[in-house]
Amino acid sequence: MATTASSLLKSSFAGARLPASTRTPSSPAVVATPRGAGAIRASSISSSNPPYDLTSFRFSPIKESVVSREMTRRYMTDMITYADTDVVIVGAGSAGLSCAYELSKDPSVSIAIVEQSVSPGGGAWLGGQLFSAMVVRKPAHLFLDELGVAYDEAEDYVVIKHAALFTSTVMSRLLARPNVKLFNAVAVEDLIVKGGRVGGVVTNWALVSMNHDTQSCMDPNVMEAKVVVSSCGHDGPFGATGVKRLQDIGMISDVPGMKALDMNTAEDEIVRLTREVVPGMIVTGMEVAEIDGAPRMGPTFGAMMISGQKAAHLALKALGRPNAVDGTIKVVSPALRQEFVIASKDDEVVDA
């Protein structure tokens, strides 16, 4: 059955803005009343007893071999299914998860997420300096409304009381969809490149990848993909690996690294410069700052969400599907439509 453009993208880009909370000079910077579709009312919390007797609870019997077979059969089936897929997303931080969420709205697109850590989410489990709150500048709060994440609202930004509320919500919504598989504890060791185009990734168990120097040779596996989205984060021992590998193999000339912190410039630049940097590979999130020399962003997260969504629509465009980049899906909000500008691939380094 054909999917219409209107039904394909029921996202924050077609949503209505929430009015800013009215503040007086004596008001706190952040309004205390939670806003957003996920705001919880005390009356909605059920106080009923569990549907079983806790004093004499017993589980149904099971053979240990059944548990082993269920895990093994399902995982191996997923490996076979996603050995050749539409999109592979490398890195399950806030940008990668936002990209996967947006992409998976089209049920005909198969998506594999590869995350080296056992626990996906990247740096989005906390705000800055290990603090709990997550700050999101408007109008990216519309994405939170879509997800149903509650927040406190100020005039130009919103605050989620704990960053884990965003990460756990987008992850649970995403992984419930049948066209997505998260392969966590799996590392991407290299790219598949054929005829100047990225055509997939080379994978290995993360623990194996971390111990190549101490063990004998352990060859990897592969996943072919029509599009690879690299969301590996900023530079570090495990960061920006996608663009650094492109430089190693001569597909790009330079990875200048991100500049000093400038929140206002950085978030706009990261969204604007999210793009297909070489045929078959889209870069999103903080990895964009590494390849373009944009400023570092600091502890605000709106650009990660919107960059991920933009990467999803660039992937849809590459797949020949309706998308919000070339206008085959209409974006209602003019402010958000301006974010969807494809940066020139010729401009490799950006002066910020």
From Swiss-Prot:
Q: Repressor: is it a keyword of this entry?
A: no
Residue ranges of coiled coil: none
Give GO terms for biological process.
thiamine biosynthetic process; thiazole biosynthetic process
Q: Which residues does substrate bind? A: 95, 115-116, 123, 188, 219, 234, 286, 296-298
Q: Which reaction does it catalyse?
A: [ADP-thiazole synthase]-L-cysteine + glycine + NAD(+) = [ADP-thiazole synthase]-dehydroalanine + ADP-5-ethyl-4-methylthiazole-2-carboxylate + nicotinamide + 3 H2O + 2 H(+)
Localization per Swiss-Prot or TrEMBL? Plastid, Chloroplast
* Single GO cellular component term: cytosol
The protein's Enzyme Commission number: 2.4.2.60
**Cofactor annotation:** Fe cation
Which GO MF terms are attached to this record? cysteine-dependent adenosine diphosphate thiazole synthase activity; iron ion binding
Keywords, A to Z, come to: Chloroplast, Iron, Metal-binding, NAD, Plastid, Thiamine biosynthesis, Transferase, Transit peptide
Q: Mark out the transit peptide.
A: 1-41
Q: Which residues carry this modification: 2,3-didehydroalanine (Cys)?
A: 217
Cofactor remark: Binds 1 Fe cation per subunit.
Q: How is it modified after translation?
A: During the catalytic reaction, a sulfide is transferred from Cys-217 to a reaction intermediate, generating a dehydroalanine residue.
Concerning its family, UniProt says:
Belongs to the THI4 family.
What is the role of the protein in this entry?
Involved in biosynthesis of the thiamine precursor thiazole. Catalyzes the conversion of NAD and glycine to adenosine diphosphate 5-(2-hydroxyethyl)-4-methylthiazole-2-carboxylic acid (ADT), an adenylated thiazole intermediate. The reaction includes an iron-dependent sulfide transfer from a conserved cysteine residue of the protein to a thiazole intermediate. The enzyme can only undergo a single turnover, which suggests it is a suicide enzyme. May have additional roles in adaptation to various stress conditions and in DNA damage tolerance.
How does this polypeptide assemble, per the annotation? Homooctamer.
* Listed HAMAP family: THI4
Q: What is this protein called?
A: Thiamine thiazole synthase 2, chloroplastic
- Gene name of this polypeptide: THI1-2
